[in-house]
Every structure is written in structure tokens, then in C-alpha cells.
């Protein structure tokens, strides 16, 4: 999910350091602070729907990063696991780093849709395995599939996403059948 873009790793007290030897993204995207939409944060379904809604859209459509930010705890970490030069590498970002590094790519047209979900919950914590497929245009061919692993917690008033980690399906790492059945659980 939140994919294939330059990534910075934030090192506390040291500022931004390049994770993969590439120059940092040069475009900073200002993200306003707004109140969350009640429907987004009231249920796990609302949270996951918002997760996908925010990053999806046609070419030229600005993404609603302010809405996106309302879904996450302040110290959230996004981790994408990618294959680079035959090696698995994590790309670790906070929300601002993700926005700065992916906004331009998403503005070229990107749609991600959940095709299966497994949710496990224990009291105020939940884990969601969300299988997705991506397209450049809303009804275009599937360009990628993968799984988002999303950790959430309930604070008594609303849900929060604490972490998100994802990876794309590859020939050597196909999505297991249990994450592809036709119904969400």
C-alpha cells in the first residue's frame, strides 16, 4: 500500500537521514490539523474505509492528508517492506514523511481497494490483515496486490491506528489463500 516512493527514516534528535542512499523528497506538503470525522473513527470498518479513501483518487486530485492524519496516533510509524536489489528492506516513515514522499506519485492517479479482511480483537486492541489491489485508474487493470497489517486501539471514545506495515505480492511471495477468500471476516 502507501507504496514505492522515496523514503526517509527519522532518527530522534538527528533529523532526517536517508534510508536508501537516495536524496530526500524535496516537496514538503503542509497538512492541516482538523477534527476527525466521527464516521471514520467510530468503528474499525470506518477506520479501514478511510485508510483506503484518502490515498485513492484520479490523476490531479489532491489527497485529503488532514483527514488521513486524524486516523493515527501522533508517533505512528508506517513500514513498507520492499524488495530492492534482491534484498528485503523496510522503509520506515512517520505520517509527514509518508505524505512528503508519496504525494506527487499518488497525484498521478492511484486507487487502492480492499479485497479481503481478517480482523482479530482483544478488548481495546485490534489487528487487521487487509488484502488490497491497486490500480492507476479506478477501473483500470490491477497493477499490484498486497497485504496491509494494521494495529488499532480503542481509547474509550474512538479508534486510533497505531502502526501500519505492508508489502506487495511477488512471484516468490504470493498472498496466502486465507487472505484472498471472497468474504471479509
Predicted ranges, named:
Residues 77-78, 87-141:
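Surface-exposed, charged secondary-structure patches
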Residues 1-4:
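Positively charged n-region of N-terminal signal peptides that target proteins for export
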Residues 22-27, 145-174:
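Short beta-strand edge/turn micro-motifs at domain boundaries
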Residues 21-70, 179-184:
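Short, low-complexity N-terminal intrinsically disordered segments enriched in polar/charged residues
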Residues 82, 130-132, 148, 165-166:
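A mature extracytoplasmic/lumenal domain signature
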Residues 51, 68, 76, 128, ...:
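Hydrophobic pocket/interface hotspot
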